[in-house]
């Protein structure tokens, strides 16, 4: 060290500089070697490398314990030296020297505080001056800011310069860059009388200002967060009356853990009569009573609601959004059915909803039973009965028994293991014969039957077991007995709707009703509108007609076109060739249904008539849409378009009501007068051509034959709709839509129709519901049709149209087939399964077709994905005649192409409203189908196989009924005029 000081003194003496205070230089080198040498490196004439080597050596060898503390003081060394040399007294310096020896870090902190004291006297005078003129709160704030400023100055002085040194990578040059002349004068012992404003680094002040701003912002955020927490705590506190209700409900629910409760919900309600009933002298109710029920015991009523919800949703439902919506809707239906006051309804539902998702005492008891030691012992004892003990184990356990030696030897030499009774796993492919219906007692003079002593031709229906157990499906044989009943009950006679009709053999049937004479003239105004909008048309060519078809139909009609080029159409081409329709029959709903008959004419006749009708079909549909003022005929639409249009019609009314009505055996009720009205539209569009008139005339008087293996039939019939005619669909749409339009116009109601032939849904306001329902049956009967009005519904999800219901898929409404029916029906096939591979091809084809219709739908998506996963490449099986008339009919005509997608909570809730499957049940069924692996072998059980792994497949869910919105019926004819405003004001001012 001495040599180093001498070297420095000699170096500085060679320069034109005053003498250096060697004692202070030695003390600084001893206490702050690195900082001092860094300053000295800036003196001209001194070797930088030399001082770097010496400083590094000194710090490593003698002052290694001071290196962390010295690094802190490197931030602004020039200011420290100046203040240390000239600002501190000898006493303070000696005190610092003693502290450094004992505790280096404490000494440096003390020195830093002493330095800052030099700059604080001005704060005292400023504080005294401001205190007299400023308010107390402002003076306090300024004092806090000043303290924060100097506190930040103390803490961050070293940090700021350390950062600066690090960024330059030359810490020994920091003094030179900051202040070069001031430290020189200080070490040379010269007094500094003026201060340079540049001595303080601008970065230090900027950083200190940022720290103060950050501190103020932190204080503001602390206050804000504190207020937010207090506000949230206050929001979580119930008002006194609600806290009292909560405690009451909680206490009532806790009573279940103390004893069994037998509640009766009606005992907790008080009836309040708003409007008494009006009854005449004869006892006839002129006006029904209007009453509401108030909840008199909130806790017990809520407990009853919770109990009913748990029974509905099978215990504790999972806490999902879909389940929350379903539970809320169920609780609302219960309260609405009981007539509870709306305010009490909301109060009770809000209190009961959370407790439905919490386990009750009974739920806890169930869980305890399922997991207790007794249960485990019973299960273990049951499992032990299936565990097999090998012959070797028996021999080792008891070698003195000869039977054990025999069994062991048998297992070695014969390899015939001993096992108990085991049932072979049955395959999933089932084959069932067609059904034979009961003979009919109906007779008609124009139906001639000839029976043969032969066995009928037996059809077969195939089933994939394990996919659905709700319903059993069958298939009618094409036999003489089935044909006789189909012709008698679906062509000639209908169910007896008359009370005075006396039948000769079977009183349950009578002839179809005849329309009122001339009734169809009421529809002439609509006919003229259709003809005007469609315009005059001409028949299309053979090539254009053939372009409407493909596959087997194209081949059939191509041959007919060639035949017509050789000889013209004749009356024999209009004769009917009748047979039993091969369709899947729900034998669970109807054990003995009447067979449907198909009555097609010769393809030659269809070609000639089709050239007049095929190209005007959709223009007529559009004309009917114009008459109704919106989309009415839903032919050719996919499931998305139909669902969106139905929801659009429902949204048109504030309180909508949908009334579905099905024309019972529509084709059988089409009379001669109805056919002539329909034909007049076609002839008017084409200008009454002779050939078209002749072709349509042959539809008025029909002659048909039917052949089976065990019989022959010949019959004559006037009128009726023949299911194989070219105008079957078009004619039914025309008749149904115009008859309903006449009903709506005659009643003067605002309504929208959804029509697809004989499937109809009329959407109107709840105010018009009663009027429409009362007039519906009589109005259709005037036209010769029987209709059955279904129960009105009030939400979109419960509208049933073409055996489908709208379900919201997250973006739009989509028509979905009923899963309770289709899970069983789509597992049945009328396409023959010759081999296991043909069954798997059919399964894959059905799965792809179904997924295209129901992608993104609960249960249905998993169902069809299961069929796809278990199937193989479908080949051309989907092009077969049997397949095209099944599930893929909707797909083929609607051109839907949906894909598998995640299922949203809104979709699950909408699916629950439509079909009754709760979200938990949906998830459970999807889990079953996702893990199902089918055994593709033939089943030989002799009975339809069931699915014990998933009992939900055998249960029919209960659809949640939605009550209509409360509204007062519209008074269409006021009995008394309303009072003018002047009289109302007088009435209000009169004393009570």
UniProtKB/Swiss-Prot annotation:
Taxonomically, the superkingdom here is: Viruses
Provide a Gene Ontology MF annotation, just one.
nucleotide binding
Where along the chain is composition biased (Polar residues)? 964-974
Instruction: State a single Pfam family of this protein.
Output: RdRP_3
Report the subcellular localization: Host membrane
Reactions listed under catalytic activity: RNA(n) + a ribonucleoside 5'-triphosphate = RNA(n+1) + diphosphate
Q: What is its EC number?
A: 2.7.7.48
Q: Which residues form the RdRp catalytic domain?
A: 656-772
**What CDD domains would the database entry show?**
Panicovirus_RdRp
- Could you list this entry's UniProt keywords, alphabetically sorted: Host membrane, Membrane, Nucleotide-binding, Nucleotidyltransferase, RNA suppression of termination, RNA-directed RNA polymerase, Transferase, Viral RNA replication
GO biological process terms, semicolon-separated? viral RNA genome replication
Give the residue ranges for region: Disordered: 963-992
List the GO terms this entry assigns under cellular component, sorted alphabetically.
host cell membrane; membrane
InterPro entries per record? DNA/RNA_pol_sf (IPR043502), Rev_trsase/Diguanyl_cyclase (IPR043128), RNA-dir_pol_PSvirus (IPR007094), RNA_pol_HCV (IPR002166)
Query: Main role?
Result: RNA-dependent RNA polymerase that plays an essential role in the virus replication.
Give the free-text miscellaneous remark of the entry: Readthrough of the terminator UAG occurs at position 426.
Protein family: Belongs to the tombusviridae RNA polymerase family.
Q: Tell me what this protein is called.
A: RNA-directed RNA polymerase
């Amino acid at each position: 060290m001495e040599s180093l000081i001498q070297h420095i003194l000699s170096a500085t003496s060679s320069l034109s500089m005053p003498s250096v205070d060697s004692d202070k230089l030695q003390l600084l080198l001893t206490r702050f070697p690195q900082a001092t040498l860094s300053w000295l490196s800036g003196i001209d004439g001194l070797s930088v490398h030399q001082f770097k080597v010496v400083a590094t050596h000194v710090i490593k060898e003698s002052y290694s314990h001071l290196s962390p503390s010295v690094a802190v003081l490197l931030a602004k060394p020039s200011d420290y030296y100046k203040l240390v040399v000239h600002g501190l007294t000898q006493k303070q310096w000696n005190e610092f020297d003693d502290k450094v020896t004992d505790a280096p870090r404490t000494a440096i902190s003390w020195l830093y505080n002493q330095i800052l004291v030099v700059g604080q006297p001005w704060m005292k005078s400023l504080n005294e001056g401001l205190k007299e003129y400023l308010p107390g709160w402002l003076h306090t704030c300024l004092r806090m800011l000043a303290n924060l400023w100097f506190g930040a100055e103390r803490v961050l002085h070293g940090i700021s310069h350390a950062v600066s040194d690090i960024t330059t990578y030359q810490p020994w040059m920091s003094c030179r860059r900051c202040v070069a002349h001031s430290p020189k004068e200080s070490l040379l012992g010269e007094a500094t009388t003026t201060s340079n404003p540049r001595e303080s680094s601008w970065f230090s002040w900027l950083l200190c200002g940022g720290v103060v701003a950050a501190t103020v912002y932190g204080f503001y955020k602390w206050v804000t967060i504190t207020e937010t927490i207090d506000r949230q705590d206050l929001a979580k506190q119930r008002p006194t009356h609600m806290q009292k209700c909560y405690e009451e409900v909680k206490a009532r629910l806790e009573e279940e853990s103390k004893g069994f409760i037998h509640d009766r919900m009606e005992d907790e309600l008080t009836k309040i009569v708003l409007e008494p009933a009006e009854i005449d002298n004869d006892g006839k109710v002129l006006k029904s009573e209007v009453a509401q029920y108030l909840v008199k015991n909130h806790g017990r009523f809520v407990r009853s609601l919770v109990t009913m919800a748990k029974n509905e949703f099978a215990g504790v439902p999972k806490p999902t959004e879909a389940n929350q919506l379903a539970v809320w809707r169920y609780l609302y239906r219960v309260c609405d059915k009981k007539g509870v006051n709306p305010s009490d309804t909301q109060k009770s539902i809000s209190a009961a909803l959370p407790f439905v998702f919490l386990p009750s005492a009974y739920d806890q008891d169930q869980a305890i039973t399922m997991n207790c030691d007794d249960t485990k012992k019973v299960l273990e004892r049951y499992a032990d009965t299936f565990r097999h003990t090998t012959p070797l184990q028996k021999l080792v356990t008891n070698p003195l028994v000869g039977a054990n030696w025999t069994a062991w030897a048998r297992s070695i030499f014969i390899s015939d293991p001993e096992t108990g009774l085991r049932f072979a796993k049955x395959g999933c492919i089932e084959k069932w014969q067609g059904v034979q219906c009961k003979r009919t007692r109906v007779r008609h003079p124009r139906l001639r039957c000839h029976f043969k002593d032969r066995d009928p031709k037996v059809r077969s229906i195939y089933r994939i077991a394990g996919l659905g157990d709700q319903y059993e499906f069958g298939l009618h044989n094409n036999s003489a007995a089935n044909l006789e009943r189909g012709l008698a009950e679906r062509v000639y006679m209908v169910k007896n709707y008359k009370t005075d009709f006396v039948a000769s053999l079977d009183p349950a049937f009578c002839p179809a009703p005849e329309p009122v004479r001339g009734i169809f003239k009421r529809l002439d105004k609509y006919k003229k509108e259709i003809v005007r909008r469609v315009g005059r048309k001409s028949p299309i060519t053979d090539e254009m007609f053939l372009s409407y078809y493909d596959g087997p139909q194209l081949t059939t009609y191509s041959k007919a076109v060639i035949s017509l080029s050789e000889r013209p159409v004749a009356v024999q081409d209009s004769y009917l060739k009748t047979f039993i329709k091969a369709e899947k029959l729900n034998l669970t709903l109807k054990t003995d249904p009447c067979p449907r008959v198909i009555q097609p004419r010769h393809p030659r006749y269809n070609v000639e008539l089709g050239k007049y009708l095929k190209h005007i079909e959709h223009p007529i549909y559009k004309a009917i849409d114009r008459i109704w003022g919106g989309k009415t005929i839903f032919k050719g639409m996919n499931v998305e378009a139909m669902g969106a249009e139905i929801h659009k019609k429902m949204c048109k009314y504030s309180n909508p009501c949908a009334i579905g009505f099905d024309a019972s055996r529509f084709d059988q009720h089409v009379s001669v007068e109805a056919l002539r009205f329909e034909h007049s539209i076609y002839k008017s569009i084409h200008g009454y051509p002779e050939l078209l008139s002749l072709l349509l005339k042959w539809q008025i008087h029909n002659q048909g034959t039917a052949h089976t293996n065990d019989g022959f039939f010949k019959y004559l019939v006037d009128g009726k709709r023949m299911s194989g005619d070219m105008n079957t669909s078009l004619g039914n749409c025309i008749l149904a839509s115009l008859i309903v339009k006449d009903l709506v116009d005659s009643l003067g109601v605002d309504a929208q129709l959804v029509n697809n032939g004989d499937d109809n849904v009329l959407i109107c306001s709840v105010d018009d519901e009663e009027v429409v329902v009362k007039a519906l049956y009589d109005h259709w009967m005037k036209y010769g049709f029987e209709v059955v009005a279904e129960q009105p519904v009030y939400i979109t999800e419960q509208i049933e149209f073409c055996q489908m219901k709208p379900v919201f898929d997250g973006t739009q409404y989509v028509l979905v087939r009923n899963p309770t029916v289709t899970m069983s029906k789509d597992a049945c096939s009328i396409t023959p399964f010759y081999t296991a591979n043909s069954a798997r091809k059919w399964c894959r084809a059905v799965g792809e077709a179904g997924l295209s219709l129901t992608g993104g739908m609960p249960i249905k998506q998993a169902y069809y994905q299961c069929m796809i996963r278990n199937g193989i490449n479908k080949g051309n099986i989907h092009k077969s005649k049997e397949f095209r008339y099944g599930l893929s009919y909707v797909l083929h005509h609607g051109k839907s192409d949906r894909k598998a997608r995640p299922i949203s909570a809104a979709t699950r809730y909408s699916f629950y409203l439509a079909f009754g499957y709760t979200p938990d049940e949906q998830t459970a069924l999807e889990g079953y189908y996702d893990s199902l692996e089918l055994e593709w072998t033939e089943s030989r059980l002799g009975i339809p196989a069931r699915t014990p792994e998933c009992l939900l497949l055998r249960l029919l869910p209960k659809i949640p009924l939605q009550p209509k919105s409360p509204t007062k019926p519209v008074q269409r004819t006021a009995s008394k005029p309303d009072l003018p405003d002047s009289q109302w004001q007088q009435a209000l001012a009169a004393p009570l």
